[in-house]
């Protein structure tokens, strides 16, 4: 992705919501590599899908020869960003935030190259400059450059001020100053000339641009990526179980893969532009092939494969595909102990049973049958399988051989209704 037309290419992919002084930024990029940054506040112990677009934008810029700075907000994470939030955030302890900072740094690192010469990525933490700053320095050197009149007119703050049930504390009101100073500080330390972020960060970004100009007399820029929406109007990046996380311990690679497999046809080609590095030509060609094939589209499989590999690596992708293939075929022989652990984590409904349980009661407990009588009928009708093998004995009681890796049993009614039994010793 050549620097001279990078902004244009991002726009063609639908990745630009707003940009400050677009012509001047394009001119600056055409002159040669710049340093840019994106901030990630540790408000949880993992990033989620909402963070992926700006994170991948950092990578797109690095691939084009620019120097990315990934800023984790060890200080701002202690405060909480009020932007477009309906209520005050819960303040977390410094110990918790420090742990989350480290986890998020580890999550960001694989997406960027930290050893590639002049445009090697930099990992930064804003606690490094705020941790030792006293309140008088903050008020004199930063606060004096901010107009309260302008701050309360920012859309992100105005929404909170206009709510009768929720005001805004001075703590959260001050967040705008902290993020603004981040930009000025990174400009001074690393020559950072561009901040990218989600569209909800526009007010914070423009504050940083203004403060950098006042403190250092430097022209810097801001670019926001759009809030990702689904064509049906529902929230992107959410499932019935909540947010889709990048941490495999919070959202398993299998569940992550399935999230993308289930993308609607109306969204999938747009998401390929947002979340993959396929060229627009390749995406358009895939769309044309899908439309003319008369078969189920390939695009969801391509999207799931590329994004799962990006986030969970080749091993995570292979496991997710193996689990998907095994469940579709009803054959569990390929599944590993880790695969079953993923299913127990969040991959399918599950129950815990004590050893010695009979099949009829297990079907009732797993909500695969409404009663023991109905369970008996299902078994006798050859509709029930255990670990992929049909079971027709209505009086069957589970034995040791049914416990895969000594721990799990896969129960199935019909072709698609599964439950995973985890055995209690």
From Swiss-Prot:
GO MF entry, a single one: RNA binding
Presence of the UniProt keyword Membrane in the record: no
Enzyme class (EC, first level): ligase
Biological processes, Gene Ontology terms: tyrosyl-tRNA aminoacylation
Domain spans labelled S4 RNA-binding: 357-415
Binding annotation for ATP: 238
Coiled coil: none
Motif 'KMSKS' region, residue range(s) on this chain: 235-239
EC number, as in UniProt: 6.1.1.1
Keywords: Aminoacyl-tRNA synthetase, ATP-binding, Cytoplasm, Ligase, Nucleotide-binding, Protein biosynthesis, RNA-binding
Motif 'HIGH' region location, chain numbering: 42-51
Signal peptide: none
Subcellular location(s) of the protein: Cytoplasm
Catalysed transformations (reactions): tRNA(Tyr) + L-tyrosine + ATP = L-tyrosyl-tRNA(Tyr) + AMP + diphosphate + H(+)
One Pfam family this sequence matches: SYY_C-terminal
Role, per record: Catalyzes the attachment of tyrosine to tRNA(Tyr) in a two-step reaction: tyrosine is first activated by ATP to form Tyr-AMP and then transferred to the acceptor end of tRNA(Tyr).
Subunit structure as annotated in this protein's UniProt entry: Homodimer.
Name assigned to this protein: Tyrosine--tRNA ligase
High-level lineage: Bacteria, Pseudomonadati, Pseudomonadota, Gammaproteobacteria, Enterobacterales
Gene name, Swiss-Prot/TrEMBL: tyrS
